[in-house]
């Protein structure tokens, strides 16, 4: 192939098509645990609502309730992946391997979204949330109340049940239940067998399993790190803002 602008543009079109096809067809898990919010600026400020009002009977004048808003700033990051195409391969029309490489790049780019999104779960033990505490902490505040969304027990039917009960017990400033409904259990591959037993077995240790079918299972290696090799997470992903 003669190297000129027209031929190079043709290569760009071919490589872009291969990349985009793989990008579109590769499936991800991030939609199960995170809400996608479009961004059109370098820095985005999100107003997190500490306590959203609930419906009540309308008697007399409206009672206007102020939203407890806290600012949470996120600066967008840029990511890149670059490969070189050898000039000799262009001149010799030896480009088939590069087309496959572009497809692999598209697949890797899509999978990187899972690495970032699902990787935020183990990152939540140190990364600060909107209240300047780690996302998973034992002393989050709602008004003059505090609640914990962090545990240390290894995954078992007992600890799973305790986590469900703890989540369901969380109330707002006025003492009304937040109606949290755990529906997704996220585990690393090392805990898949135990998780499947909890969610699918008819019996556990000879007694009826009350947790059969109580949640969907997501197995993902991105929640493992050296500090927390046996991480497991129970999430309510039924809300507009996940988790």
How should each PLM-predicted stretch be described?
Residues 80-82, 103-107:
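Contiguous, well-ordered alpha-helical segments that form the cores/surfaces of helical PPI scaffolds
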Residues 2-3, 9, 138-173, 179-243:
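Sequence/fold signature of self-assembling virion shell proteins
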Residues 51, 71, 86-90, 110, ...:
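An acidic- and aromatic-residue-enriched active-site/binding cleft used to recognize and process polar
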Residues 20-77:
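Assembly/oligomerization interface modules of large self-assembling protein complexes
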Residues 41-45, 69, 73, 88-102, ...:
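Short, charged/polar micro-motifs that form catalytic or ligand-binding hotspots
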Residues 76-91, 143-146, 179-182:
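Glycine-rich, often proline-containing surface loops adjacent to acidic residues and nearby aromatics
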Residues 88, 93-96, 100, 107-169:
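Alpha-helical scaffold segments that mediate packing/assembly in large oligomeric complexes
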Residues 1-43, 230-231, 240-241:
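N-terminal catalytic cores of peptidoglycan-degrading enzymes
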